[in-house]
A protein has these predicted regions:
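Conserved thiamine diphosphate
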Residues: 669-670, 693
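C-terminal transmembrane helix pair
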Residues: 687-692, 704, 708, 754-756, ...
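...captures the hydrophobic TM-helix bundle architecture rather than a specific catalytic motif
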Residues: 1-497, 520-550, 575, 592-612, ...
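Conserved RecA-like P-loop NTPase helicase motor core
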Residues: 654, 681-685, 690-694
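Membrane-embedded alpha-helical segments of integral membrane proteins
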Residues: 1-2, 672-687
Length: 802
């Protein structure tokens, strides 16, 4: 295992150890013990920056090589950017949680176990080159996020939010798995690099579009794109450190990563271009609009996250057009990819600081409701400064980093009208219009967060706690992120060459060697800057009149667009349908369950034999049936009929024993004396046990059965018998593989020094099978003995009490 593989699994290993050392270190906050892990990983991944500027680092470890499944790790510009965000933000969140979560009140071992499992899952997603390994880590993110969102499981809303996120993201994951399988069918490889290298061949396959749609479903569900965005607002029931980590920099960016990673493969299709662009721009608009009507600070940030994710998704969709040009060094559509990568980084910084700021406000005032907040700037000046930087960066105001990437976003949306592909020059005019309107709402909700929380009058009578400034431990992580927001805004080229360029090259492999990124705070009077002026002007008007139009958009949204209600209704009817089906199937009668199982067996086996044409029998090669065989078969048939229609238990037992002894004669004729002896012993013991047990049972009563049950029993009995007979004949006449009998004959004496082949098979070749069967029987015997002994003990106690 390489250091890269160890870096991925290290948080998971630590997560497994946390419950062990937690009980011995309760005097120390668990966060202090685990904090070095993400810090060390962040420093480790920083060392890859020079390497990714020269190319990707690839390390592979065999896992299931025969199936083409290897744990291959690739560190290129894109995966490194995400790895730095995962470990960097993870370090700050871990530090923040030490002061946010009380040592005595919270289940810290659970929290950090779930958090570090999630960290491993995210690192695995962004660093894995193998599709199957990526999918396993992908689903681990869903499971660990479910545990984190439902951390306060005693709250009904937390459980609801956790279930909702799990249902939607796991659904998307399964769809994405289907897309991965289709890619494997088309390319005969699970390696993402190999699949992308064969993009020209794969794009002509009939499975290309279905694979694309399935993979996009997985990406859209994870990154909360419309209409799958409904899980993210309910996920805000998680503790604020979880929201700051999962819902600003990591989990919700996983879908963005998938779209960016597969852009070189699918960008040739107009379906990819329009689907990603339109879903992204729709999500941008819908998220920003809904954020303006919320009163909970976390809810506003949730919808703002949805909106910002849509912005990045739209940029990736527009940027896909860049792969259609031969000369990419000065292609204007490459700048859309640059803007997407840049805003992905910027969003993690300002949104992470804002989530932490909201956590501080909630922690120190006891509420997140903006109707109860106000005037906190005088009481919490440092927190107010953090909020000012974060909200103005999110609104796209200079000199913060959000302004730069927002300008690049506007420029990319305007340039799409010049694209002579996919009819973008006509329909593409809608994208800059919607983008501008959505940006106006983005400005409005950003101002709502800051001004309605920190300006105006303090309302102490509405606050559960007396507000005060947070301790330095809570303030330090958002301060660090705010420094990045300002620093990158003033000096954006600090990250342009070492981080942004390698990431863009990973998404657009055909970039020329002289391609470089240069970002400046002042770039002249451009259409993008004029759009920003318009956003600010109209945004101020809408903010000042917010109380007048907010009720209108709150009440006038058509019911058809309330997707959350549709989800709730769907889950309700699904649960009701499942309950009714369960009540129909689970009758409590053993015969009902047997009927279901036997009916399914008959239908499945009959269907398989018919569709595989397995009913072609050759009787000429079979052993000839003698008179003795006929007599023995007749005896077995007579005893079976007698057992079925017998009115006496004793008679049934005797007939059952007679049938077993007759079968042993078959073994003697077939020259299998060991089997015959075993059969005789088993039959004798069985008859004796039956007689002993039946002696203690109540008197046999003949229950009159309804004709329909008798008919069902008859049909199933005959059906199973016929199917077993046909399967036996088919298996005898159909040989897909060479018989293994010759292997046992040749090796029984040589390998095991045994002349009795049956004994050698049971004891040597299938020794483990025999041993475990013996173990199962022993466990069953112990269970029966314990039940009998417990019953006798209770009976003795009762007698003694009497």
């Amino acid at each position: 295992m390489s250091f890269l593989h160890l870096a991925i699994v290290l948080p998971f290993i630590v997560a497994l150890l946390i419950p062990l050392f937690y009980r011995w270190t309760k005097q120390v906050h668990t966060g202090w013990l685990v904090l070095p892990i993400p810090v060390i990983l962040f420093i480790y991944f920083l060392t890859f920056i020079p390497k990714t500027m020269d190319g990707a680092t690839i390390v592979s470890m065999p896992w299931i090589p025969r199936l083409g499944i290897n744990f291959t790790v690739v560190v290129d510009g894109l995966s490194l950017l995400f790895a730095l965000l995962i470990t960097g933000i993870g370090s700050l969140v871990t530090f923040y949680s030490i002061y946010y979560l009380g040592k005595k009140k919270e289940r810290l071992s659970n929290f950090y176990t779930f958090l570090f499992i999630f960290m491993t899952a995210m690192l695995g997603v962004v660093l894995s080159d193998n599709l199957i390994v990526l999918y396993l880590f992908w689903e681990l993110t869903s499971i660990s996020s479910f545990l984190l969102i439902g951390y306060w499981y005693h709250r009904e809303r937390s459980r609801y939010g956790a279930r909702k996120s799990m249902m939607i993201t796991v659904f998307g994951g399964l769809m994405m798995l289907g897309g991965f399988i289709l890619l494997h069918i088309m390319s005969d490889s699970f390696s993402i690099r190999e699949i992308i290298s064969n993009a020209d061949v794969i794009s002509n396959n009939s499975l290309f579009i279905p694979a694309m749609i399935l993979i996009l479903l997985g990406a859209f569900t994870k990154s909360a794109q419309v209409p799958f965005h409904i899980w993210l607002p309910d996920a805000m029931e998680a503790p604020t450190p979880v929201s700051a980590y999962l819902h600003s920099a990591t989990m919700v960016k996983a879908g963005i990563y998938i779209v960016a990673r597969f852009t070189p493969l699918f960008a040739s299709s107009g379906v990819w271009f329009w689907t990603v662009s339109l879903v992204g721009i729709t999500t941008l608009f819908w998220g920003s609009l809904n954020a303006t009507k919320k009163n909970d600070l976390k809810a506003i940030l949730a919808y703002s996250t949805i909106s910002q994710l849509g912005l990045i998704m739209a940029l990736l969709g527009v940027g896909a057009a860049s792969l259609h040009f031969d000369t990419l060094s000065d292609d204007i559509y490459v700048m859309a990819i640059v803007a997407a990568v840049f805003h992905l980084f910027n969003h993690a910084t300002f949104k992470g600081s804002l989530f932490m700021m909201v956590g501080i406000v909630d922690h120190e005032t006891g509420t997140r409701d903006i109707r109860r907040l106000g005037g906190l700037m005088r009481i919490m000046p440092i927190t107010a400064t953090i909020a000012f930087i974060g909200t103005f960066a999110m609104a796209g105001i200079p000199p913060f980093n959000g302004f730069l990437s927002k300008e690049m976003f506007f420029e990319s949306m305007v340039n799409i009208t010049q694209l002579q592909l996919f009819d973008a020059s006509t329909w593409g005019v809608l994208l800059p219009v919607v983008a501008w309107v959505a940006s106006v709402f983005t400005f409005v909700y950003s101002m709502i967060i800051f001004f309605k929380t920190f300006t105006g009058k303090v309302k102490p009578y509405l606050l559960p706690k007396k507000p005060h400034e947070a301790p330095f431990g809570l303030l330090l992580p958002p301060i660090i992120l705010s420094i990045f927001v300002v620093g990158i805004g003033l000096f954006p080229n600090l990250i342009a060459e070492p981080i942004l360029e390698p990431a863009v090259r990973a998404i657009v492999p055909g970039l020329s060697t002289d391609f470089s990124i240069h970002i400046s705070l002042w770039h002249g009077f451009t259409p993008a800057l004029l759009m920003t002026f318009g956003v600010v002007a109209l945004g101020i008007v809408l903010f000042l009149t917010h109380k007048y139009w907010k009720p209108w958009i709150t009440t006038k949204v058509p019911k058809a667009l309330r997707i959350g209600k549709t989800y709730d209704n769907g889950m309700y009817y699904l649960e009701q349908g499942s309950y009714r089906m369960t009540m129909f199937i689970m009758t409590g009668w053993l015969r009902t369950y047997l009927n279901y199982m036997l009916s399914a067996f008959i239908l499945m086996m009959a269907s398989v034999m018919i569709f595989t044409q397995a009913l072609d029998f050759n009787f000429s090669s079979m052993t000839k049936v003698t008179v003795v065989d006929f007599v023995l078969a007749a005896v077995i048939l007579v005893t079976l009929v007698g057992i079925v229609f017998s009115k006496s238990r004793i008679t049934s037992i005797i007939l059952l024993g007679a049938m077993g002894y007759t079968i042993s004669i078959f073994f003697v004729i077939s020259r299998a004396p060991d089997l015959a002896l075993t059969q005789l012993i088993i039959e004798t013991i069985s008859v004796v046990l039956y007689l002993l047990v039946f002696y203690h049972l109540p008197q046999f009563s003949n229950i009159e059965e309804k004709p329909k049950w008798l008919s069902m029993k008859t049909f199933l009995s005959i059906g199973v018998g016929v199917i077993i007979t046909l399967v036996s004949l088919s298996a005898y006449n159909t040989t897909f593989y060479d018989s293994i009998s010759k292997y046992y004959v040749d090796n029984a004496y040589v390998e095991a020094a045994g002349r009795n082949i049956v004994n050698v098979i049971l004891v040597d070749f299938r020794g483990f099978d025999t041993m475990f069967e013996t173990a199962v029987l022993s466990i069953a015997a112990i269970g029966i003995y314990a039940m009998i002994k417990l019953r006798l003990t209770k009976r003795g106690e009762n007698d003694e009490n009497e």
